[in-house]
Each structure stands twice: as C-alpha cells, then as structure tokens.
C-alpha cells in the first residue's frame, strides 16, 4: 500500500489548500501531484474529452523545478507546485493554442497570456489546455462529456475546465465568462466558479469574444481554493487597457468571518421565473433560509430595467465578436464551423446605431444596479445559477417541454448569469444540492464591484454546513 505522499487515489482528491499544506509539510511533492493528475487524464480522457493539449513533459519538468524551489526555501505561494488546467483560448508560450477551432489549428504563441504568466509566477503547473466551444462562441466538437451524465451538456464555453476539475485531473482551472461561461459549467459540474469584477483579471493574450463583456476567472472544488486562485491571477496589467488599478486584497483574510449582519437581496419575481424547475427552486430557497439562520439579512428587492438586458448583451456580444473575427472570416472563413461562421456574420448586419443604443442601455443598467446596492445597503444578490439542471445534448436547442413560451435550455441557462457581465460586478456559483435525478444544482451570488471577498465569505459559510462540494460522479472512473 502506497502512502498519502504518492498514492494517486489520495492525491487527486485533495483540494488546492490541502495539497499546498502537504507540500509544505513534506508529505508529498509537486512531481507526485503532477504524475497523479497525468494518470487521471489517461484514465478519464477517453470518456470525457476534457483536454485539447496535454504537454506532459513540460508539466513534469515544471513540477521538478517547483520541488527544487520549495526545497531551497523559495515559496511562491499557495499555488506553488499545484497542477492547474487552462482554457484553450489563453495564449501559452511554446504550447499550441487553438481556441477549439480549425482556424487556429497548430498555432503556437510566442508569449504567455497574462493569466498564464501570473500562474507561472505563482509556481502553478499547467497540466493541460482544456477544451472549449469554438472561439468560446460556437460549437464544442468533438463534444466534451458531462461526468455526471455522459449524454448531457457539461456547460460551456469553459467546458473542459469544468470537467477536468470535476474528474480530478486538475486541482483548479482557468475559465472565461462573457455571459455565464464560468458559472454555467461550475453549476453543472458541482464546482465553485467565479466571474470576477470586469478588469480584475487581465484578458491580455486571451482570444477575444467580446471586449467589453469578457472576464477571466477561476474554477475550483472549494470556495477557499477559488479565493487562493483569484489572489494569484488578479492584478493590474499595463498590456490590458481594461485592467483595473484597484488594489488586490488577501481574499482569504475574512473568509471565515460568517454572515451575521450581511445583507443579501433577492428579486423572487425575476429569479424564480416560470423556467425555474422545482428542484432548483427548493435548493435555492434552502440556501436563503440557511443563510438567514446564520444571521444574514434577506432583503426583498426589485431588479432594475431587466427587460433591457437580454437584447443588450446579445447585441454587444455579436457586434464585438464579428468585429474581432472580420479579417479571419475573410481569409479563413471555410475553416470555421458553419454555425459559428453564420453567427459571426450575423453580427456584421447589426446597425452601428443599434450597437451604440445598447451600450447606452448597459450604462443605465450599471448605474441602476449600483444605486440598488447603495439604496438597500446590499452586500450581495442571490439567485439560482441555472434555472434547471443540465439537459441532454440532443435537447439543448429544442423548446423545453415544461414551458409554453418556446424557451430552449440554452436560452434558459443564461437567464441568471448574463446580468453580471452587463453590470461588470463579480458573481460566483457554488454547489447547493442535487436534483431528483442526481444532477448538481448551484446557486449564484452577485456582489459589489471589487468585493469578491464578500462573495467568498458568504459562500464559504454555506459550504461549511454541507458536503455537496465533496460529492463526485464516481461512475466515470469505473
């Protein structure tokens, strides 16, 4: 019997914080963690297809270097020596970056994206590039499979990042979020996923979907791990004009302070709309009730101008995506998936006046959200992350049978997520139970700009009362 230092069945189930503690106590090594992750990739990849590229030798070399640095007393922080997945739209020097598209097939950047550079500076081990929808916008082919139900949608566009962390082949992963693409797979995979405040994490070197809506953030198994990852990747970046200058705090400093006196708002009319299924409704109401029992103040509110946001988000995203891809569409249009190409071309037909009108509507919405937080003295807003658990891949674009308005699952999935992209405020999804079919359910907290620490504090308090985050889809490993 191998001991905990080398037994991969022990190592892969450690959280980032647990693995970091073992590294510093000499109970394991970065090399052992990395070998365990690579073994898990080999065991699960044929089933779930989470990775686009696995640079195993580079990862092993980095792990040996991490061990040598730690032995010499050069401790880079809590991610030092920890295997992390990176969404394949983030540039990685000397490692192929394809963004899920034949358009970029074989492309090897000559520099790292800032988020990858920050991970490297923190001593993290890039275990692999995770699969995503084409340019974080189109299709996911060949499809990444949900480890909870192989014929169901695992969420996207940070598809592989969510699945990799779920099957324990990475301890955490980087995702991106333009309308929900971190929080959707986090909810579907029983993970913690954070979309930080706009500009909190640099998007330099990340393939653009929508300049004014894109966010880069962490996906992890626990709230504490998420706080540790955000602390490592958040910074001001002179290479990114949208990067914020706000100082980066220690996100773990007040994480255990509890929720007594914390004010959490809910607009039940909006967040519990008819598309929310009973299992999700009950799970979310349970979170609200438990937080109230812990001392939080639950405040009934009305969200502002919500009828503006769907059109605003889609218009801005379509125009900015088509602008970014205009030259590539003309030069390599035949290499795009037809669905992606058609969607991008549609964005070119949107009048400039309509785009500007939507930008102005977004600013009115942002102002109204800020006023709501100030007027009601809110620390967060709460909702389900997803109105329903994941659907079968074959049903994603079919009208839901439980609704009479023709809404498809893919439209339902962004109902609660896209407003945080428009508002630019931070939003986190965390586990809160399972459906009657055994599928994960997540709840969402949206906070004040640059107050990710409060979201971690609330989510950590709830996490301590349950073991939801510890449950995993063991059938995938059989």
Positions of PLM-derived features:
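Short helix-loop capping/hinge segments that flank enzyme active sites or metal/cofactor-binding pockets
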Residues: 7, 79-99, 253-268, 316-370, ...
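Conserved short alpha-helical elements in the N-terminal third of ANL/AMP-binding
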Residues: 96, 419-422
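Short glycine/serine-rich loop/turn segments
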Residues: 79-216, 267-269, 381-405
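Short, well-ordered beta-strand elements within core beta-sheets of diverse protein domains
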Residues: 19-25, 85, 103-107, 214-221, ...
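Structural helix-boundary/capping segments
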Residues: 17, 43, 121, 125, ...
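Short, surface-exposed loop/helix-turn segments at secondary-structure junctions
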Residues: 102, 106, 144-145, 242-246, ...
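An N-terminal boundary/leader segment
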Residues: 1-60, 280, 293-295, 354, ...
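Acyltransferase
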Residues: 27-35, 64-67, 276-302, 325-331, ...
